[in-house]
């Protein structure tokens, strides 16, 4: 009974919710064998043709390359790209690529030399003699990626599935209208595909290997059955035609009955899926030693006169392929890369073929129909009925249009496979897939910005923590350095400070001498000044005598003598009071020079005044005033306390006073005569 149940379950297939049945339009291109076309004169090879980062460039402008030569290094998850033919690298520059907006990607531009020479190829015909890790590395370095449309690096995918996968599924459904690349490849290269499947099974070692193919490909089914006639390790499952049966989650559910959880992947339930084109590329990389330099591309649509499937070299401009298919463009001709439901319109035809290019559709105006105007959603729920991912497209539409990113995320917009079934059935002609693509791009941008902000915050907090640790370490060092020294060290420090202070005090202390004390050389200075005064008096005596004989008044002479005596006493008193204070030596020298200048000036004035007649009354008044001032100064001098006197200044002042006294006496003698 268990054997009957297992046999029944072995061939059982399941179904998924939703899905549509659009016109297939496959007979235009699947009736003719694969063909080669002439090489293009120039190839543009984008460095990024897969999910993930681009590889590191390893060629320069002017280098000559061979077909299959690596143009970039494949380190980590970076997948290398290879030269599609032999020629010369003429540029490494940004170029428009296969993208709805024709975004520019860094590309290697090669001028073909027409020789199409290969690198030296080394195949592993006995691949079982090599380890699984070596096979994965070879697949990765030979640039094999998912050729079903995703472009995920095959080596990375296999590395993550070792010893975790129970079911290996080969996707041969090819459910989208117009596309027949996989169909034709299975018809012409079934044996090579099966060999590639066995290489994948050797690496993953799953419990079962399933090939899922729709029933609208009878020739391909026949070829595969012929190759698998005596095989028991691979099962061929023919499934009903329904779009999108070729989706990874949908085909997994059809063949295994298991559903991939929201936000998860097929590997979460022990399933790994590869495309038939990928299996063929694995065989060529491992057994033949050929990197992926070409792939099958469907050329179809009523605007081409020779539709079919061709071997297209990667990097070939789309224009070159269409021209070889008899492209007859109309006034407003549209060219779609991919199928009519999941593909995108090319802005121009100079973009190159890449690893994920499976179809070039050039429909006529009648084939596409007149463009329909978008109207408001009527909430008919037709989109929800057609959605194969069990989503609510009408709600996602409102959330996307209203920029409600959180609600769109909560309604699992990330699970949308962008199959276009909802837009196909929408009676309001709303391009729902375009809204969903834009919303997912905005959500990804927001998450990327949040991630960058979190990383920046983490770096800032780490820096602040590091600065705090350094500050604490500095404070600890300062505290340890501030420990009090020993008692003997304190005594030595105190003695040194005392010596320094004593030296400073001696250097800044002024020389103070009490009033009345004179230096040892005061007598010599006084004698020298006296001799100088006598010499000056003799020189001035002759003119004074001459002027005196002219008839001076005796009373005027007496008054002048009294004034001179009063001034002399005043100057002596001032000299005594000033000498009692501490004096700066430089200041004393300046004051002495000023006093000498004043004395000379007074002598000159006295000589000039002596020649003029004097009023007796005026002289008497001046004499009385002089006596009064002299008495007042004597009283002030008595009241002023005696202070320390600078001996040098005192000596200078005393000498000046004596000179003036002698001068006054001489003047008096002259007047009396």
Curated annotation (Swiss-Prot):
Enzyme Commission code: 7.-.-.-
Residue ranges of the TM segments: none
Residues where [4Fe-4S] cluster 2 binds: 387, 416, 419, 422
Keyword Electron transport included in the entry's annotation: yes
Domain (4Fe-4S ferredoxin-type) ranges: 368-397, 407-436
A GO molecular-function annotation: electron transfer activity
Its membrane topology: Peripheral membrane protein
Stretch list, region Disordered: 529-554
Binding positions ([4Fe-4S] cluster 1): 377, 380, 383, 426
Entry keyword Repeat: yes
Keywords from the UniProt entry: 4Fe-4S, Cell inner membrane, Cell membrane, Electron transport, Iron, Iron-sulfur, Membrane, Metal-binding, Repeat, Translocase, Transport
Localization per record: Cell inner membrane
InterPro entries on file: 4Fe4S_Fe-S-bd (IPR017896), 4Fe4S_Fe_S_CS (IPR017900), Ion_transpt_RnfC/RsxC (IPR010208), Nuo51_FMN-bd (IPR011538), Nuo51_FMN-bd_sf (IPR037225), RnfC_N (IPR026902), Soluble_ligand-bd (IPR019554)
Quaternary assembly: The complex is composed of six subunits: RsxA, RsxB, RsxC, RsxD, RsxE and RsxG.
Similarity section: Belongs to the 4Fe4S bacterial-type ferredoxin family. RnfC subfamily.
Protein known as: Ion-translocating oxidoreductase complex subunit C
Originating species: Salmonella arizonae (strain ATCC BAA-731 / CDC346-86 / RSK2980)
């Amino acid at each position: 009974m268990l054997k009957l149940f297992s046999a029944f379950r072995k061939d059982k297939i399941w179904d998924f919710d939703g899905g549509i049945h659009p016109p297939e339009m496959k007979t235009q291109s699947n009736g003719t064998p694969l063909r080669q076309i002439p090489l293009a004169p120039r190839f543009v090879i984008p460095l990024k043709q897969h999910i993930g980062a681009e590889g590191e460039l390893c060629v320069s402008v002017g280098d000559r390359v061979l077909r299959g030569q690596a143009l970039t290094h494949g380190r980590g998850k970076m997948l290398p790209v290879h030269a599609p033919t032999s020629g010369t690298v003429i540029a490494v520059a940004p170029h428009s690529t296969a993208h709805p907006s024709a975004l520019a990607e860094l590309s290697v531009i090669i001028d073909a030399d027409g020789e199409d020479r290969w690198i030296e190829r080394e195949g592993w015909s006995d691949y079982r003699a090599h380890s699984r890790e070596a096979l994965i590395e070879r697949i990765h370095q030979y640039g094999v990626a998912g050729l079903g449309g995703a472009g995920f690096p095959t080596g990375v995918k296999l590395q993550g599935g070792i010893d975790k996968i129970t079911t290996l599924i080969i996707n041969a459904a090819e459910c989208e209208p117009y596309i027949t690349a996989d169909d034709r490849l299975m018809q012409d290269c079934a044996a090579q595909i099966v060999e590639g499947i066995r290489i994948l099974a050797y690496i993953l070692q799953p419990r079962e290997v399933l090939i899922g193919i729709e029933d609208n490909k009878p020739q391909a089914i026949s070829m595969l059955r012929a190759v698998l006639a005596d095989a028991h390790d691979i099962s061929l499952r023919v499934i009903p035609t329904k779009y999108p049966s070729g989706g990874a989650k949908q085909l997994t559910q059809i063949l295994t009955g298991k559903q991939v959880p929201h936000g998860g992947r097929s590997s979460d339930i022990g399933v790994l899926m590869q495309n038939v084109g990928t299996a063929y590329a694995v065989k060529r990389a491992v057994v033949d030693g050929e990197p992926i330099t070409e792939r099958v591309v469907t050329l179809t649509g009523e605007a081409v006169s020779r539709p079919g499937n061709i071997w297209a070299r990667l990097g070939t401009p789309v224009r070159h392929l269409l021209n070889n298919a008899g492209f007859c463009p109309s006034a407003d001709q549209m060219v779609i890369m991919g199928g009519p439901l999941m593909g995108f319109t090319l802005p121009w035809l100079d973009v190159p073929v890449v690893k994920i290019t499976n179809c070039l559709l050039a429909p006529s105006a009648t084939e596409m129909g007149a463009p329909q105007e978008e109207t408001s959603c009527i909430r008919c729920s037709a989109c929800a009925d057609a959605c194969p991912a069990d989503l609510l497209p009408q709600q996602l539409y409102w959330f996307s249009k209203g920029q409600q990113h959180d609600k769109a995320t909560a309604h699992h917009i990330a699970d949308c496979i962008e199959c276009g079934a909802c837009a196909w059935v929408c009676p309001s002609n709303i391009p729902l897939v375009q809204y969903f693509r834009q919303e997912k791009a905005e959500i990804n941008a927001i998450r990327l910005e949040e991630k960058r902000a979190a990383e920046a915050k983490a770096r800032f907090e780490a820096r602040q923590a590091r600065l705090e640790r350094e500050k604490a370490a500095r404070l600890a060092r300062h505290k340890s350095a501030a420990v009090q020294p020993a008692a003997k060290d304190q005594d030595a420090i105190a003695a040194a400070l005392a010596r320094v202070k004593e030296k400073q005090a001696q250097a800044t202390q002024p020389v103070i001498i009490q009033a009345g004390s004179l230096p040892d050389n005061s007598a010599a200075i006084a004698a020298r000044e006296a001799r100088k005064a006598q010499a000056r008096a003799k020189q001035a005596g002759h003119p004074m005598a001459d002027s005196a004989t002219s008839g001076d008044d005796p009373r005027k002479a007496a008054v002048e003598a009294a004034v001179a005596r009063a001034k002399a006493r005043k100057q002596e008193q001032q000299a005594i009071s000033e000498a009692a204070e501490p004096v700066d030596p430089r200041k004393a020298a300046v004051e002495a020079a000023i006093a000498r200048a004043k004395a000379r000036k007074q002598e000159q004035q006295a000589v000039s005044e002596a020649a003029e007649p004097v009023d007796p009354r005026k002289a008497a008044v001046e004499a009385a005033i002089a006596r009064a001032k002299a008495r007042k100064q004597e009283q002030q001098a008595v009241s002023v306390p005696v202070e320390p006197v600078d001996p040098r200044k005192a000596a200078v002042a005393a000498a000046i006073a004596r000179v003036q006294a002698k001068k006054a006496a001489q003047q008096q003698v002259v007047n009396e005569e």
